Each structure stands twice: as structure tokens, then as C-alpha cells.
Amino acid sequence: MVVKGNTSTGTITDFNGTFTLSAPADAILSISYIGFKSQEIAVKGHKDIKIVLQEDSETLDEVVVVGYGVQKKSVVTASIAKVSADDLASTAPVRMDNALKGLASGVTVTSSSGQPGAAAQIRVRGVGTIRTENGAADPLYIVDGMPLEGGLDYLNPNDIASIEVLKDAASGAVYGARAANGVILVTTKTGKIGKTKVTYDFSYGWQSAWKKRDVLNASEYALMINEGAINAGIAPKFSDPYSYGQGTNWQDEVFNNNAPMMNHQVSVSGASEKVNYLFSLGFYTQDGIVGGNFDRSNYERLTLRSNTQYTLFDESKERNWLNSLKVTSNLSYARIKSTNFDDNSTWGTPLGSALALSPILNVYDETEEAIKAQFDKYGTTAEYTPVYDPRNGKLFSIPGEFGEMSNPIAKLSLPGDKHWSHKFVANFSAELQLWDNLKFKTSYGADLSFWGYDSYRPLYYLRSGESSTQSSAYSRKEDGTVWQLENVLT
């Protein structure tokens, strides 16, 4: 239960259905529960509200994917959570893994990074004891019948028709030990009977930090340093603390306000009695609110998909055993480019430095002599190679007295690693309906992945212990191939 228009204000009922919620007198409550129809109730100033939900019998007739087949929800005894395309459209997720947040019971989705395109961790009913080759407790991902490795970042959420999460031991009867941590079945969209449908969706938005920490300004900082010195029995460092004024708020300098994000989606689909087809193209870009303006936190994804199905022949009175033959091909390609920086280190990250660095220090130094003096005082054997802002040519300052931290803006201005990946997934199948209750399906799938990164490190000096005395370039490329041949008789 949430307040409509303010999803951060909500609650859940106890075992008896009782709830307590603080809401405005004119608020509208949005109530939902699995197996019942969602309702919206106006508070109208009432303190006590009695709500009776109506059963949603239509959900029991929904078809869900279970292993090698499909069943109606009303006859399924296993624990399955289903997320439809309409559910996904309401949240507009960037990645498939983030699409499950709050939409599937028993599924925990957590993000350890806020950088654009960052992967989320999915756990189905906690952490299992059987791990994957890399030690993770990830569920088994199957897209259109093809088991996939390396995550689902290549999937365009707009191409997804439904997601089924198999959560109990029943999935182990089909997939074995691979299903120990749950199974996530993804079915992509197909065409619908009727005229050819062409759709184009475009969205453009901006991102900014929603909250900043309260920190000391320069005068307050100088007063506190002086107070600490007096308490330690030494002379105060700053003779006139109030002369420093507001100083530098490093959070304002680090955050990239109004970071853009853009999404293009094009699809062509349709179907007849013999042919079903869907072709789609997606292009998504996002700049990070930290480093996006320096090309240090950016994400770009291009996706192509072709789903086709041909009915070569269907049921005929001339045959009493060979009812139908359908041939299906699902082809997809994804190209992803991204840049990022280390965001899980206390002091080495831009945000960590922005919260701890002195507000007395300026972002830039007026003269190179001041920088050289800092280097001579705190520098080591590293060569003197100051860093200039590529946007305006100004010279970045060196926080010499803060040996464990560097100027975060100077650090962001340096070139970062440029990651890239190409992924091709193809799945071909032929389904033969031998008799009314006997079906044979053969399928072949292949997953080809190519990934790597390119980096360049110029000469620079940020602080003692963080410098580069020689230029270097590095390039790394890897690839992997997974294929599957499957024959199923049901």
C-alpha cells in the first residue's frame, strides 16, 4: 500500500490485514495484493478505513512458462513469480536485472554501484550453497530456451514479453544443480495477428544528485582546526579564520548536474496464419552524475533483435498423425560501451575526497609557481607533471597536506578505461506436433561474446603516491562461446 504520487510513503499490513499509515487528508491510497485486483481509495480525512479487495480470477488463467512447457497458473503447484511487459513498462528499467525490483516476491535485487549501466545482484530466496564457476550465487538465466552466461545486460527491456522466476526445488527436476539458486526464464516479444505495427518511442531526461551532505565551509573548517590545535596545546594555524568565507564545496564541484539520458526504441511487428515476426532496434545512452562530464562515467547500449516464426504446415484432414510443423528463429545482437571509475574505495573516489577534502583548498591554482611549491614540499621522486582542466586550460591544485587524497576534479579529468562488449545470441528451433498429445522439439542455440577494454595513461602528478612518470597504453580482448543442442519430447 502506497500513497499515489509518492511511492516513498507506504506500508504493509500485518497477518490480520491491519495497517497504519501517515498520509495527507486528501491523499489517495493505492492498494495491491497478489491474486486480488488493485484498488485506489480516497482518504477524505477519515482516520479509520476499511478496505475489501476483490479476487482477480483472470490471473489464474494466465499462462506461465515452466521448464520445457507452459501451464495455467490455476494448475501450477510450484512457486513461480511472473512479471509481464505491462509491469516492466510501469517502471521503465534500464537493465533487465533492475526490472525485477519490487515486482517479484522472494526475489532480492541490490545495486552496489550507482554508475550508469551498473549491474545489479539478484538473489532468489537468499544465497544458495551451490555457486557458479566464479563463486557467485546467481540464478540460472534462460532466454527463449537458451541458457546464458555473463548476465543479461545485453537484453533490451523493451523486447521482453514476460519474466518467470522459478523459486523452489521443482525447477531442479528440469535444470538440475544449475537451478540451485533459482531460475529466471525470459520470453521475448513476438508479433500479433493483424496489420504490420510500427512503433517508435523516444525519451530524454536529466539526472542530478537528490541530496548532498552538510559539510563545513572554509571559515568553519579553519575555526575547528584552530580549536583542535588549542586543545592540543599548540599555536592556532589560521590567524583569521573568517577571512576564508564559504570556500570550496567539493560536492558542488564533483557532481555533474543535469546529466542527460536518452532512449530510442523502434520496432516492426505483425503476424498472419503462417508467419509471425518482430524486428526491433534500441539505442540508450546515459551520463553519470559523477564524472559524466569528463567521459569517466558513461554508458551506451545498441541492441538489435529479430524474432520470426514460420508455420510450414498445420493440421489437415489428410493426415492423422503429423499435425503441424513450426520453425522459429530468435536472433539478437548487443554492443555496449562504458567508462567508469573505482567507486568502492573510501578515500580514492571522487565522492570520498569531496566529503573529506579541505574547503580552504581551491579547485585551481592561480599560478604554476604555487603548484611547483606544493610539489617541492610534498612531492617524491616523481616527475613534476601538473594536470590542466581540458575544459578551460586552468591548472588544478594539489592538496599537499592531504597525502591520502587527490584533487577529485583533476582525477576525473584524466582518461579512464573504455570498456566494450559485443554479444550475439542465436536460437533456432523446429517444433513438430506428432499427435494431439505428443510434441517433439529440436533446438540449437549459440552465445558468442567478445569483450575487453582500452586504456591510456598520460604523465600526471596528483599527489605523493599517485602519479605517472611515463605514458602507457593498454588493450585487452577476450571472447567466449556457448552452444546448446536440445531435443525434447513432451
What role is predicted for each listed range?
Residues 1-327, 425:
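Short, small/polar-rich motifs associated with maturation and membrane association
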Residues 438:
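An active-site-proximal structural segment forming one wall of the substrate-binding cleft
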Residues 74, 193-247, 291-299, 303, ...:
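Surface-exposed loop/interface segments of Gram-negative outer-membrane beta-barrel transport/assembly proteins
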